[in-house]
Amino acid sequence: MYIGKLGDGTHADDGIYVLLKEVLDNAIDEYMMGYGKQIVIDIDEVSVTVRDHGRGIPLDKVKDVSSKMNTGAKYDSKAFKKSVGLNGVGIKAVNALSTEFYICSYRDGRCKSLLYNQGNVVTDFPEEPTSEENGTLVRFVPDETIFKGYKYKDDFIESLLKNYVYLNSGLTILFNGRRFHSKNGLVDLLNEKMTAEPLYPIIHLKGDDIEVVITHINQYGEEYYSFVNGQHTTQGGTHLTAFREAASRTIKEFYNKNFD
């Protein structure tokens, strides 16, 4: 897994945001598989808590999933198409890079939790009954000897969460009490980013494995937002290059033909 630069949180690509994203990705995967419509995130001065309402990790697998390599559980055909990560490395990396890492799975009226320090088990709590809804709770404190003087910036987190809800219309994310939700998905993203009225209604195309929204405004320049497997590809990639070439070619072919 790639953490990126360590940093202290002053840049959007600093490692502490990658840690948050790795935990969130598991919750998002649950939503994409049809389980849980809300994710709750609480961040204070040092700790991060993420609670989803998915199925919950099988109770006998919580320790393996959070600390043993190559023990991911997303291996059906739909997961291969949609999931951000399949081998389960992300959550283990967060564990290893945290001075405190607590995970609790709520499943069918029972729960199982563990507390770690830098990847080492501190307390393996016994399984017990619970009245909590199904899902998983993760709380972690990034290791300040690695991420020196770190501090999360709300602006960076809010930008990340907006992308999550644009890509997963119908999902609700609560961040320190603030609600993020999108009814129209990527159309909402485009409407937010536009700096002028569109020259024509937004074109929205959606298939099983691709979604495209596009329009033009009466200004110079171009602006693209591309995503793969739920991740914002800020540097573009072959997917963006291919789309731009196809869009340009289609317009040229259309206007070079004779029409009645």
Cite the ranges covered by each PLM segment:
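GHKL-type ATPase core
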Residues: 49, 53, 60-61, 73-194
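Ordered, soluble secondary-structure elements with a strong preference for glycine-centered loop motifs
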Residues: 6-18, 33, 52-60, 87-91, ...
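Conserved beta-strand-loop-beta-strand hairpin that lines the nucleotide-binding pocket
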Residues: 28-75
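Active-site phosphate-binding and catalytic loops of NTP-dependent enzymes
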Residues: 5-9, 27-40, 72-83, 103-104, ...
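Flexible hinge/switch segments at interdomain interfaces of large molecular machines
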Residues: 1-9, 43, 129-139, 212-229
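Bergerat-fold GHKL ATPase/HATPase_c domain
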Residues: 1-24, 28, 64-66
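GHKL/Histidine-kinase-like ATPase module
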Residues: 155-158, 162-164, 170-260
